[in-house]
Regions:
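Catalytic cores of processing enzymes, dominated by hydrolases/peptidases
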Residues: 155-199
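Catalytic-core regions of hydrolytic enzymes
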Residues: 46-163, 170
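N-terminal Lys/Arg-rich, disordered targeting/topogenic segments
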Residues: 1-26
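Short amphipathic alpha-helical signal-transduction/dimerization elements
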Residues: 92, 96, 165-172, 221, ...
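Contiguous, function-dense segments enriched for cysteine-driven chemistry
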Residues: 3-9, 39, 47, 122
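Active-site-adjacent mobile loop/cap segments within catalytic or ligand-binding domains
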Residues: 131, 138-139, 180-234
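Membrane-entry signal-anchor segments at the cytosolic-membrane interface
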Residues: 20-29, 46-50
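Hydrophobic membrane-insertion alpha-helices, especially the h-region
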Residues: 26-43
Length: 234
């Protein structure tokens, strides 16, 4: 009898030990799974931070003037918002082919508030910010290309404007109206070197015709891109 009783007790003890080991094993699996989830979550946060820091920023921000309900200068069938967008998109492609990350204030016919454009550039922490526009004059006599900067930014924006102006004139052979100072919103509210290039007068019939051709738009884009790269490589 004692032997049978001892065997029953041994079996019960063995079963309890097995249950205990099973519970311990399940607990350890739970802890391990929890730690893995925590690691994945922290890894996700780290990846998101890296993305925001390195990938969501941009080297260069391009601003195609006007857009949406704001057409800009509108002479006959030449609309400023359409021309500036085409030039900006071509410039973006050239700069990206050169290995730079480019952000655009707009990539289609969208209205963007003027004050939001420099805010966008500031969020991107870009090295430079370039706004592209077409010019106009009341009597139609205006002709040529000019680039603006603000003296509030010091020599950096002036140098950027010079490089863009020189390169665009070289690529287009347009009349050189030189660089000029102004306190436009996009110039003064951005935190980085900024320039605004007026690529020609829509009120001038010969320039208006040129500005609507793909070849001339490409020449302008090549000049703008070259000027930006020349400034960055200084």
């Amino acid at each position: 009898m004692e032997t049978k009783t001892y065997k029953r007790k041994s079996r019960k003890q063995l079963q309890r030990k097995r249950r205990r080991r099973k519970l311990i094993r399940l607990f350890l699996i739970f802890i391990l799974a929890f730690l893995i989830l925590i690691s994945l979550f922290l890894g996700f946060l780290a990846v998101r931070q890296i993305y925001q820091t390195f990938f969501n920023n941009a080297d260069i921000v391009l601003d195609a003037g006007h857009g949406g309900k704001d057409p800009g200068a509108n002479i006959d069938d030449a609309i400023e918002k359409d021309i500036t967008l085409e030039i900006a998109l071509m410039t973006q492609e050239i700069l990206e082919d050169a290995g730079y990350k480019v952000a655009m204030t707009r990539t289609d016919d969208t209205f963007v508030e003027l004050t939001e454009r420099p805010v966008f550039a500031n969020k991107k922490k870009s090295q430079v910010f370039v706004s592209i526009h077409c010019n106009s004059s009341e009597d139609g006599s205006g002709k040529g290309i000019e680039t603006y900067y603000t003296e509030q930014k010091g020599i950096s924006s002036e140098n950027l404007a010079k490089e863009i102006q020189n390169a665009v004139i070289e690529h287009t052979n347009a009349d050189n109206r030189e660089i000029k100072t102004a306190n436009y919103t996009v110039l003064v509210r951005s935190n980085m070197p900024t320039a605004l290039v007026e690529v020609g007068f829509l009120t001038n019939s010969s320039e208006r015709e040129l500005l609507q051709t793909e070849e001339y738009q490409k020449n302008l884009a090549e000049g703008i891109a070259e000027g930006i790269l020349n400034y960055i490589h200084q």
